[in-house]
Amino acid sequence: MFSYKPPSKCQPEGSKVGQWTICQIPLKDGNNIELSRYAKLLPHRVLQQYEVSIWLDSNLIIRDTILYEQLIKKIGEGYKWYGIKHPILDCIYDDARKCLLTAKARYKDVKPQIYFLKTEGYPHHFGLFENNFIVRRHNDHIIKKIDENWWQLFSTYSKRDQLSLFYLFWKHGFSPKLIFPNGESTHNSRFLKFIPHKQLSIKKKIKNKLIEYQNRLMLKILD
């Protein structure tokens, strides 16, 4: 089990924290968001010696060993990518709107990305994953292409990785598989414990309200 972090004297490369081995992120000039996404979007660059990787967001805890057994079985089936279906949405365009209405992204960052998707002819309701739990054969050539393109779009447009993944599945003609059956997500699975993010400070809440207000004024692009 590996945890990727920026360079730190307190947790040097190769040190252990419980079952986790600390590995430094090989990205020199990234901000906190980019550092956190590097290993997630580009596992083939940091785990070349392994055939399969499992990405788990820091707000998820596996609480039943049966899940490990199920994952081993799924990996043995030979599929290249497993994810978890979004519990509510099935469309990048709808998720973009939600990001704007909840101040998770700014209109100026989302607008060019949506314009790009529309000019590409990307369809509505093509699908959506949560992206907080991913199992993939990251060294497979098609998965490498998807992940490299994923990082490129993430770096070019908004820092919301959900707004580009299913476009890449569509672009590459790739069909991922589900970790859980339809209707089961990280929020209701008995195998996982979902930990809500920390409460925002008053200053951050005010800032987000201003961003939300600005976004609402500019939402015509998504209509």
Positions of predicted regions on the chain:
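Glycosyltransferase catalytic domains, chiefly GT-A lineage
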Residues: M1-D223
